[in-house]
Amino acid sequence: TGSFTFANTAAFLAGNANGFTSTLGDVSTAIAQGALGLFVQDNFKVRPNLTLELGLRWDWLMSPTERYDRFAAYVLETNSLVRVNNGLAPIYQTNWKNFQPRVGFAWDPFKDGKTSIRAAYAILADQPVTNLVTGNATNPPFATSVALPITIPTTKLSNAITVAVPGATVSPSSSDPGFENAYVQSWNLNIEREIKSGLAITAGYFASKGTHLRLTRNLNQTFLNAALVPTRPFPALSPTSPIAPGVPLQNITFRESTGNSSYNALWVTANKRLSRGLQFNASYTFSKSIDYNSQSSQGVTLQDSNNIKGDRGLSDFDARHRFVISGLYELPFKKDSALGGWQFSAIVQLQSGNPVTLLAGNAGAITGGAPAANANSLTGLATLRPDVGAPITISPVAATTGNGVQWFPNLVCDPRPGGSCPAGAVAILPVAFVSGKSIYHFGSFGRNTIIGPSFTNTDFSIIKRTKVGENKIIEFRWEIFDLFNHANFGQPGRTAQVGSTTFGVITNTRFATGDSGSSRQMQFALKFKF
C-alpha cells in the first residue's frame, strides 16, 4: 500500500501520477522493556511537635529490546545507520543512576495543634514508553519509507528494499543512542492555620523542574545556500554506513532527551468541615508553566530544529489563575418533616485561558534556485510561525461575526511583490526579505504567545431525602451542569493566511456538546434505599 502524488488537479483526473510513496518491509515488532524498582521509606518523631520523613527509591529502567534485534539507529557522529547488536548495543544506554530521594517534615511550631508547617522535596524518574524506539524498527533493512518517481525500472516486490531505484531516498526515524531518562524535581512549602473550630486556611508554594525531557528534532532540516538552493546538511548517508551506504537522505526524525520544563505556583485554600449543615472548600492558584514541548508524540513540533530555545514558552496547559469553590448546605429542619432532608450543593470554577501558538499558512514556494519547494515541506513540519506585525489587542468583549467570535484582528501581510499587506496586519508571512532576514526564514512569533478565552462553569444540585418507615429512604436528585448556560469558547483559529475568514476566529466551544462545561444540561434521579 502507499499513496500517489499528482502535479495538479488535471493530472489527478487523468490518472497521471508523478510519484509514489510507500513503506516496504515488515514493520511488525516484538518490543519488550524491563524495569525494577526498590524503595525504602520511614518517618521519625524528632520531637513531639516535629516529624521527619525520609525515603529513597532506585529504578533500573532497562533499554527496550526487540526479540529479533530488528532495530536500526541513526548515529549522528558518523552519519550512518547501524543495526543493534551489529555495531550498536543496546538501542540506548540503560541509566543506572536513577536514585530518587524524598525528604519532608511536618512541624507544629506553637505546640497547640492549630498551626502546621510542612515542606517536602523529591526526585521522580520517568520510564520512557516503548514508542520512543518503534521508529527504529521502520528503518532499513527491516522496512523503509521510499518516495519513488513514476518512471522507475520494474522490479519484484520481494526485491523492493534492496534494489537500486533511481530517485529513491530514505528518511530515518531514530532514538538518540545517548538518550537519558527524564526526571522531575518537586518541592513545596505549606503553612496551615486553624482559624476556629472546623475552619482552616492553608497558604503554600509548589514548584517542579523537569530535566532530560523528550524532544523530537529533524536533524536534516533544509536551509537555503548562497544560491538560494534548498540544501540539506546530510545529502546522503555516509559511504561507510553499515546500512544503505550513500543512499540520499530526506528528513531525519531524531528523538532525544534535551528538553526541560518548570512550574511555579502559589496557592491558598480554605476548608470548612461540615457543621450546622454547612461545609465548603475553596482554593485559588496563581501559577506559571514553561516548557519546550507539551506533547509526547513522536512527530517534530519545534519550529526550528537547530534552535531548541526558540520554542521555549508557556506550556499548552498553562492557566495563570484558577479559582474553585465547592460547598454543601442542608436546611436546618428535622429530616422527617416536610422541609427536612433538603440539601443544596454547588461547584464553581473560574480559570484563565490557555495559550495558543500562531502558525503561518500558505507560506508559498521558495522562488530562488531549484527545485522550488514549499517552506513547510523543507523543514519536515507544519508549525512554521509568522513574523510579528502590529500589536495584537484582544477586546474585553470579542466581536461576533457571521463566522464566529473574532478574538483578535485577522489582518495578515504577504510582503512578496504583488502580495497583499494591509495596514495594521498582526502577522507577516515569513516568505520574503523582511527586516534583514532572508527570503526563507523562521517567523519571529514566539510559541504560545496568545492567550485564549477563559473558562467559567457552575454546577448545582438539589437533593431531597424522605424517610419511609424505620429504615427506608427515597432520594430525589436534580443536578444542573453549567447552571447559567455560560458560553465557554474554544481557541481561536491560529493559521495566518491572507484573506482568511477563520484566523483569529472562534468557531467552537471549549468542550464538545454533551460534555461538562459545554452547555446547560440537567438530569434527574430517583433512588430507593432499603
Where on the chain are the PLM-derived regions?
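Surface-exposed extracellular loop regions of Gram-negative outer-membrane beta-barrel proteins
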Residues: 62, 114-151, 211-217, 345-357
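A short, structured beta-strand-centered segment in the mid-to-C-terminal lobe
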Residues: 88-97, 151-154, 312-318, 326
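Short, solvent-exposed turn/loop segments enriched in Gly/Ser/Thr/Pro and often Arg
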Residues: 56-69, 120-128, 206-209, 285-286
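Surface-exposed patches in mature extracellular/periplasmic domains of secreted proteins
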Residues: 53, 114-118, 337
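Short, glycine/charged-enriched secondary-structure capping and boundary segments
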Residues: 67-70, 132-135, 295-297, 492-493
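Signature of Gram-negative outer-membrane beta-barrel scaffolds
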Residues: 1-110, 298-301
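Short, solvent-exposed micro-motifs at the edges of structured domains
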Residues: 32, 49, 61-63, 157, ...
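Acidic/polar loop-and-plug regions of large Gram-negative outer-membrane beta-barrel proteins
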Residues: 10, 14, 18-20, 142-176, ...
